[in-house]
Amino acid sequence: MKKVKQIRVLKPFDLLSEELVFIILDLISPNPSDLKSFSLTCKSFYQLESKHRGSLKPLRSDYLPRILTRYRNTTDLDLTFCPRVTDYALSVVGCLSGPTLRSLDLSRSGSFSAAGLLRLALKCVNLVEIDLSNATEMRDADAAVVAEARSLERLKLGRCKMLTDMGIGCIAVGCKKLNTVSLKWCVGVGDLGVGLLAVKCKDIRTLDLSYLPITGKCLHDILKLQHLEELLLEGCFGVDDDSLKSLRHDCKSLKKLDASSCQNLTHRGLTSLLSGAGYLQRLDLSHCSSVISLDFASSLKKVSALQSIRLDGCSVTPDGLKAIGTLCNSLKEVSLSKCVSVTDEGLSSLVMKLKDLRKLDITCCRKLSRVSITQIANSCPLLVSLKMESCSLVSREAFWLIGQKCRLLEELDLTDNEIDDEGLKSISSCLSLSSLKLGICLNITDKGLSYIGMGCSNLRELDLYRSVGITDVGISTIAQGCIHLETINISYCQDITDKSLVSLSKCSLLQTFESRGCPNITSQGLAAIAVRCKRLAKVDLKKCPSINDAGLLALAHFSQNLKQINVSDTAVTEVGLLSLANIGCLQNIAVVNSSGLRPSGVAAALLGCGGLRKAKLHASLRSLLPLSLIHHLEARGCAFLWKDNTLQAELDPKYWKQQLEEMAP
């Protein structure tokens, strides 16, 4: 009997080469749900997706054996969702990923020891980057084990407060290929350890020494590094004029210097620090104690090619700002946030020299008026970012100029300003606008918002916090015109109803939804967003009394990317809270003053949410929950925040704003 030949029927995708499929995967990789759909299409796609993926961010360390068995080409492993990573878990990583792994992030993980790190270092011989920030129990013995990872190029040890010079010395000797090192808040490390690092690791390009008890002594060695590009000295109180007096260097490679919060540094010390940094591009002097005067600005003579300067919280004089504009006229970014002494005269003399300015931050510069805004608009046509929160003396007419003259704006913060609908009409001409903050803008209405909806189709972020003139009509125009919206804040816009939520459900890319203090929204509106906005990651429903279990059940079923939720002061019971356990990536939950909750229901919900990192609960529950449960959850990586606030009547927004202004300096 003849055997019948089986004819293999080729499917269309069988003709695609592996390289072409990988290109397709690169294009859809930003959306995890698309990748999942692709891999579930057929066996060959499942295998190709497994072979292609190089970056993983698992929700729990328990999943590591299964995940790493499937994805054998993993090069970047991010375990920040895993608060508890044991030595066994690190052993699994070493055995299954081995020579393939190049980057590992343990910055929010604990429970591992030197033994686990040693297995990792010996197995992952090509590891070039590891983040061990927040390992507050890490000691010198652990650092000696890290030194076994000879291929390391980037190492972060922020807040490893038990480390000393000895541990850093071990790393310096063992990891000579290091080019990026962060020791921020490693308060046990001083001049000796930093000096050893500079002597042994000649390839260092980025060095973060913020809040270390160092002096200018170790800077002599650091500034000899031929490839050093970024040096961060934030909060280094030991770096003062005396310790820098004899400093002489020629660090032509240095491009960024952060000397913010160096309280003992004046223009004399800064002159020494900048003496050989002729190619410096970015300088941060925020919260320095010295007045930014003509003398201080003169220290910038050697860095005339500077492109960015931050003077947040500093006391500045008009002469100082004028000198900065004259000496550094190539500046593209200037930040004067909370510089309360900035005046129209000073700012105008600065910006009129900066024709290339792209970013300007004048947040809380309360002395500025229309004069400054006029000068900014006329002098800086290339501006892409303008932050001017709480510039309350700026009149309504000035905002019209911003829209007419600064058409390239992408980011605009007008929180707590006098802008009105005519101002919004002008700003709608900024077609590239992606972030617009209009919180506490009491003069705007739906009419003004409709201009934004029709003109700014690229809008990604919109903040309407306490802008009480906004209703469903305005939100509807935004939802229709700004379909790429990712973040919206409508908190305390009390006329908002479910109609707005139904409109916003058309914005399928929505990730952050804040509606705190909106009494007229219900679970029906929330369900509409949950069903259609699959990327939803953060939801704030505090003080929304009509939100109940039905809304949470919808979120639990449809919003599988939800990471943070606040349901304080709502009608939610333990039924809705328990349903949240169905969301595998939920990390933060806040539930305070919800009378429908029983301690047993809260306990069950907390146990069910296995990836929980932070829980904000009412203080009364602390004595009602079993102590063993609290200890168990803390061991699992969950931190508790107990709140004892009582319900307060909401203030009228105008009265609330008046109180805020009276508190301001």
Swiss-Prot record:
Gene symbol of the encoding locus: FBL3
Cystines in this chain: none
Domain F-box residue range list: 11-60
Superkingdom of this protein's organism: Eukaryota
Gene Ontology process terms (BP): protein ubiquitination; ubiquitin-dependent protein catabolic process
Ranges: LRR repeats: 61-81, 82-108, 109-134, 135-159, 160-185, 186-211, 214-235, 236-261, 262-287, 288-312, 313-338, 339-364, 365-390, 391-416, 419-440, 441-466, 467-492, 493-517, 518-543, 544-569, 594-619
Keywords for this protein: Leucine-rich repeat, Repeat
InterPro entries in alphabetical order: Leu-rich_rpt, Leu-rich_rpt_Cys-con_subtyp, LRR_dom_sf
One GO CC annotation: nucleus
Lineage: Eukaryota, Viridiplantae, Streptophyta, Embryophyta, Tracheophyta
Protein name as it appears in the record: F-box/LRR-repeat protein 3
